[in-house]
């Protein structure tokens, strides 16, 4: 498998519902590095890097709604080239 990085924006009821923390848990379980952070517009930004198949699993998890308390309306993602090395999956 090749290594890839993506950046995704998740829209809906995704702040104040544990979205970043459960995303971190799922990403670490899949062996990914990157981060999840809240944006001012109420969305969450996720950068995930790792094996292509594992990154795709995280994207599918995000699209399926994330944690039970969240309500995901839309997920946009694209390839990403982070400026620095990501050694863990963090919450920002």
UniProtKB/Swiss-Prot annotation:
One of its GO terms (molecular function) is acylphosphatase activity. Its EC number is 3.6.1.7. Transmembrane segments: none annotated. Pfam families: Acylphosphatase. Disulfide bonds join 5-49. The keyword Nucleus does not apply. Keywords: Disulfide bond, Hydrolase. InterPro entries: Acylphosphatase, Acylphosphatase-like_dom, Acylphosphatase-like_dom_sf, Acylphosphatase_bac, Acylphosphatase_CS. The active site is at 20, 38. Residues 5-92 form the Acylphosphatase-like domain. It catalyses: an acyl phosphate + H2O = a carboxylate + phosphate + H(+). HAMAP family: Acylphosphatase_entero. Belongs to the acylphosphatase family. This is Acylphosphatase. The gene is yccX.
């Amino acid at each position: 498998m090749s290594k890839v990085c993506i950046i995704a924006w998740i829209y809906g009821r995704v702040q104040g519902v544990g979205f970043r923390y459960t995303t971190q848990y799922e990403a670490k379980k899949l062996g990914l590095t990157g981060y999840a952070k809240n944006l001012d517009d109420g969305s969450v930004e996720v950068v995930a890097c790792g094996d292509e198949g594992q990154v795709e699993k995280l994207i599918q998890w995000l699209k399926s709604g994330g944690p039970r308390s969240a309500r995901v309306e839309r997920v946009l993602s694209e390839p990403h080239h982070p400026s620095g090395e990501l050694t863990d999956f963090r919450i920002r």
